[in-house]
Amino acid sequence: MLATDSDPIVAIATASGRGGIGVVRLSLGRAGEAAARALSDALCGARLMPRHASYVPFLDGAGEPLDRGIALYFPAPHSYTGEHVIELQGHGGPIVLQLLLQRCLDAGRAHGLRLAEPGEFTRRAFLNDKLDLAQAEAVADLIEASTEAAARSAGRSLDGAFSRDIHALVDDVIALRMLVEATLDFPEEEIDFLEAADARGKLAHIRERLAHVLGDARQGALLREGLSVVLAGQPNVGKSSLLNALAGAELAIVTPIAGTTRDKVAQTIQIEGIPLHIIDTAGLRETEDEVEKIGIARTWGEIERADVVLHLLDARSGLGPGDEAIAARFPDGVPVVRVLNKTDLTGAPASVTRTGGGAARADVCEVRLSAKRGDGIDLLRGELLRIAGWQAGAESVYLARERHLIALRAAQAHLARAAEHAEQNAQALDLFAEELRLAQERLNSITGEFTSDDLLGVIFSRFCIGK
């Protein structure tokens, strides 16, 4: 534990700006009950009763009221952080909150009270076993959720749904490890522990459950991160019109003049709760205009970072030499949707054709639509969801992060190797046991049983101050 993890800390816990209510939160660490009594007297002029709401004045150093509000005292360990906690709930003006914060620091100086770092309250909740690491991350995800679906999924993670699934997997792996260790520890016995206990069947069951958890986690990661979708193509094929149609608002300027869009225009929309970060880019062509060249260079940068590329073509001319040259530069591994726009000028109906694209672009499809009239926009939305791998109506989804997916995939790989060793019977039992141990270690890293201080620092530094 870091030396600073036991310092008394204080921070404004509500968002900056004006509001009806503002909260200053103190977690008293090693200073404990003595500091709670002293600060209650100094700040509120009264001894606060545990778990009672007291309407009191908040006093300055001269004993004059700065504000009046609700004071709450939660003795350890029955608090958010597991330490003695005081919350002062007053009016949400930025000046009065800063005055109250400074008053807390002055009154608590003798106890070593300092300003909290970002995420430090939740870090202490984790260190004091009030939350595991996945639940702690869910606190930040709930605050930052950009859609209702993301908020509900973060709530499920905070409630422990993700952690319970991980703990169940770990328990199963531990039980299987015990069987393997028993066989290794008693090689002279004629009993085949693995065969008698159906170890291979148990391993198959664990792998099946892990695949299900990974599927839910992928869905949750989609809700959290969303999908970056770049509109690319030659000038004047309707990229800005398509952005406006997808967003349902006039965000980009649309003119018949080629090269109108010289820099990216970005907008986040929602489809079934998934944030789609749509990026309209400069038209791709040879040009001598220096400003347009900069925009085109930025377009290729956005394409390199995209999750999906929408390659727009004019439905009247289809795929021409210029379009083929553009398509040849798209990075491998990035799904490309070929969008033939302006079907209102050809009379062709809106449609979807799944074309495939080889191993590198297995999700490639072709959508014919009219961004101007809105024909086929729903078809395009459906294809984006399909490419993302979204399964509508998934009630068990919990929000997940990239580090969770990495750990789950690593555990999956270790269990796959364990299955290979299990087929070799006694000749590879030690390797079987080691792969199970490594799988358990990767699963435990999700909930924080085996986690370095460096990783904790990165995770909690991304929280807001006061949480």
UniProtKB/Swiss-Prot annotation:
Residues reported in the UniProt entry to bind K(+): N236, T255, I257, T260
Residues reported to bind GTP: 236-241, 255-261, 280-283
One cellular-component annotation, GO: cytosol
One GO BP: tRNA methylation
Main location: cytoplasm
Family annotation (CDD domains): trmE, TrmE_N
Family designation: Belongs to the TRAFAC class TrmE-Era-EngA-EngB-Septin-like GTPase superfamily. TrmE GTPase family.
Stored PANTHER family: TRNA MODIFICATION GTPASE GTPBP3, TRNA MODIFICATION GTPASE GTPBP3, MITOCHONDRIAL
Keywords: Cytoplasm, GTP-binding, Hydrolase, Magnesium, Metal-binding, Nucleotide-binding, Potassium, tRNA processing
Cofactor(s) this protein requires: K(+)
Family matches, as InterPro entries: G_TrmE, GTP-bd, GTP-bd_TrmE_N, GTPase_MnmE, MnmE_dom2, MnmE_helical, P-loop_NTPase, Small_GTP-bd
Every TrmE-type G domain range: 226-389
UniProt protein name: tRNA modification GTPase MnmE
Subunit details: Homodimer. Heterotetramer of two MnmE and two MnmG subunits.
Residue numbers binding Mg(2+): S240, T261
Entry EC number(s): 3.6.-.-
Compartment(s): Cytoplasm
